[in-house]
Amino acid sequence: TEKEVKVYSGRHYNTDRSVYKKFAEETGIKVRLIEAAGISLIERLKREGKNSQADLILLVDAARITNAAKAGLLQRIESSNLENDVPVGLKDPNKEWYALTRRVRVMVANPKVVDVSKINDYTDLADPSLKGKVCLRNRKSPYNQSLVANQILNKGESETKAWLSGMISNVSQPFFPGDISIVRAVSKRKCGIGIVNHYYVARMLAGINGRRDALYAKRTTVLTPNPAHVNISAGGVAKYATNKNEAIK
């Protein structure tokens, strides 16, 4: 019987597919992939219960993979490779999930619209001088939700609430559906600064999205706060996986 691993993934990147292809070629294990939004995958796993076909769960956002573990959707993983390769703080103490990638929430600015020398932290986006110059994703974005949670942890609820109020009052137009659209808007001077995951800018600069997006990205300046908010994507073995060893591999 042909070996296989069924992957439920909340990641939607062509680079992942190239990894699956290489994995299949090197191991002989066929990868069967189901992609959907992270919340949808968690709900699907709950619904399927013991009848679930999932072996490996890949989710974007630390909160989502933690919630999956708390919901009893994952199982303990015994892997010396993962234990040795993944640093402390980027893995579950109960060994139910391990971070696979990190993503930094950076600010991307147009130096022709805003004075980048005066912007050092996320909190600076609440400054009245940026009125009508800030671009943001809508509040459903897990990246922004986690950023806000991180700010509450570091600066307290009242200070975070004041920051959010000030920043939102500086928003230039309706909220954006994705990070790439924010980089484009900043480049076109539709706004002066926005918050995005660092790799979107890197992908655009590399020309992965085409020459036009590469030009858009080159017109912007990336500002990384210190400390910066770093989120993860992570993987775990499904509670009722029938191909556990293949999933760990």
Predicted regions and their residues:
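Ligand-binding pocket segment of bilobal, Venus flytrap-like solute-binding proteins
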Residues: R139, Y143, N150-V222
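Early extracytoplasmic/lumenal segment of secretory-pathway proteins
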Residues: T1-N67
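Bilobed periplasmic-binding protein/Venus flytrap-like ligand-binding cleft at the lobe interface
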Residues: D121-S129, A234-K249
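Alpha-to-beta junction loops
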Residues: I29, E48-I57, L73, L130-G132, ...
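A bilobed periplasmic-binding-protein/Venus flytrap-type ligand-binding module shared by bacterial periplasmic
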Residues: V106-V113, A149, N231-K244
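Short beta-strand->loop
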Residues: Y8-R11, L74-E83, P93-N94, E96-Y98, A109-P111, S117, T123-A126, R211-H229, ...
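A structural signal for short loop-to-beta-strand junctions that line the ligand-binding cleft
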Residues: S52-I57, Q75-M107, T123, K133-L136
